[in-house]
C-alpha cells in the first residue's frame, strides 16, 4: 500500500506532467484563463488518464508486448511496433465517449471547453502518461494509480495557473508582457516551485 501512495504522490507533485515534463502545454496555456473552465478540463483529463493508462496497459501486456501472445500459441510474436497507433486509438475512443457525455449532460461545460475537448486526444500529457507506463513496466494497479495521479497533477497545475491569471487581470502588467508573455513567466515560476519536490525521496 505504501508503494502505491508513494507512486500517487510522486506522479502528482514530483513528476508533474505539466510542470516537470512540460507535456500538454497547448491546452495548459489556452484553457487556463478561467478557473471554472480549467477545473472542467482538469476533471476531463483525470477521467481520460484514469481509464486510458490501465486500459492501454491491459492491451499492451495482453496483446502487443513481446511474447504476450503465448496464450494464443504464438510465443514469438512481437506486436509492440503497433503500440503508438493502438494507444492513440484507445485515447481517441475514450475522449469521444467523454465528449458525447458532456454534450448530453453538461452542455455549459461542453461549450466552455469548445475545441480543446477533442484536442485531449492529441494532448501529449495523455500519451506521455501511457508511454511512461510502458517504459516503466507498471502493472495494472500501478497503471491505475499513476494515471489518476498524473491527471490530478495536470489538473492541479492548470487550476493554479488559471487562478494566477485571473488575479493578473487586475494587476499592473507591463504592456509588452500582457497575455502569453506573463503567462509563460508565471508557468515557469510555478515549475520552479514544483522542482523543489524533486529532492523528496519516496
From Swiss-Prot:
An example molecular function term from Gene Ontology annotations: oxidoreductase activity, acting on NAD(P)H, quinone or similar compound as acceptor
One Gene Ontology term from the biological process aspect of the record: sodium ion transport
Membrane topology of this protein: Multi-pass membrane protein
GO cellular component: Gram-negative-bacterium-type cell wall; plasma membrane
UniProt subcellular location: Cell inner membrane
Entry keywords, A to Z: Cell inner membrane, Cell membrane, Ion transport, Membrane, NAD, Sodium, Sodium transport, Translocase, Transmembrane, Transmembrane helix, Transport, Ubiquinone
Transmembrane regions: 11-31, 35-55, 79-99, 114-134, 144-164, 180-200
E.C. no: 7.2.1.1
Catalysis: reaction(s): a ubiquinone + n Na(+)(in) + NADH + H(+) = a ubiquinol + n Na(+)(out) + NAD(+)
Its biological purpose: NQR complex catalyzes the reduction of ubiquinone-1 to ubiquinol by two successive reactions, coupled with the transport of Na(+) ions from the cytoplasm to the periplasm. NqrA to NqrE are probably involved in the second step, the conversion of ubisemiquinone to ubiquinol.
Subunit structure: Composed of six subunits; NqrA, NqrB, NqrC, NqrD, NqrE and NqrF.
Name of the protein: Na(+)-translocating NADH-quinone reductase subunit E
Taxonomic source organism: Shewanella denitrificans (strain OS217 / ATCC BAA-1090 / DSM 15013)
The organism's taxonomic lineage, starting at the top: Bacteria, Pseudomonadati, Pseudomonadota, Gammaproteobacteria, Alteromonadales
